[in-house]
Amino acid sequence: IIYVFPDQYRNQAMGFWRQDGFRDKVNFEGDPVHTPNLDAFARESMVLSSAQSNCPLSSPHRGMLLTGMYPNKSGVPLNCNSTRPISSLREDAECIGDVFSKAGYDCAYFGKLHADFPTPNDPEHPGQYVEEKRPAWDAYTPKERRHGFNYWYSYGTFDEHKNPHYWDTDGKRHDPKEWSPLHESGKVISYLKNDGNVRDTKKPFFIMVGMNPPHSPYRSLNDCEEQDFNLYKDQPLDSLLIRPNVDLKMKKAESARYYFASVTGVDRAFGQILTTLKELGLDKNTVVIFASDHGETMCSQRTDDPKNSPYSESMNIPFLVRFPGKIQPRVDDLLLSAPDIMP
């Protein structure tokens, strides 16, 4: 099982919603984005058009996803930072990684977690936070808080997309100087190939990949890949932001090209994982899910807040499930939300 969930990726931002067989299944016009891998994946998947992030904010959604409980029970009612000790994943919760580990899976987590209260527990500098900023957002997750994930390559939250960092299973920090979704897809590929004997090949695997983009910032080439930005750089804003409730006069409108470039980059990273599954002969026997933690308003609804609102641009998220021979490809309007995902 592979569960890929980028951050701040709205349901409307997938190219197949503009294509035959899909556009008549929804009540919106899809964003004019380039997502060739997701377009092909959708034709092999069950696509849930009405999946919702019922608390469309990073940490609360992750708390629900990991525990199957609503924010008032998961321990994560707010975004986690060092000024909010009330918001941190419950240590006594049986989480999704615990469930799969007990069922005999080799469990791996890659990328953004953002579900723990940051404490001064830097492995390399005991007694200090892992970042100098106050309040501290980023966090190191020690082994006892990984909830069943035996392979670890993760961080709390950090928004320099071309300067990411990660802590591995043993607590060693890595600074790869690479756009984070592409770096993470590369690490997932290495795990699938079992480079360095990092997984037990006698066991099935459960992989979660928390990509940060297209989360903000999205204002320069420091935030996305140039080859993806080039697809949008000459497009008029009114040809990109096409929702009927959009306000093109908002300052944020200039960000649309970078946001959509990040969407395309995430699609490319996701495609690399799919290609590797096929090359390894694992594609027919692997459940692959593409989802998101919440959406992005992007100048709609007269709000500057990209998320944390009851609007469809914020709450309606991608949810595509592929399991060849088991799940019939189709579009379904099932009203699924985050706590439903827990087995």
Identify the meaning behind each predicted range.
Residues 1-343:
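Formylglycine-dependent sulfatase
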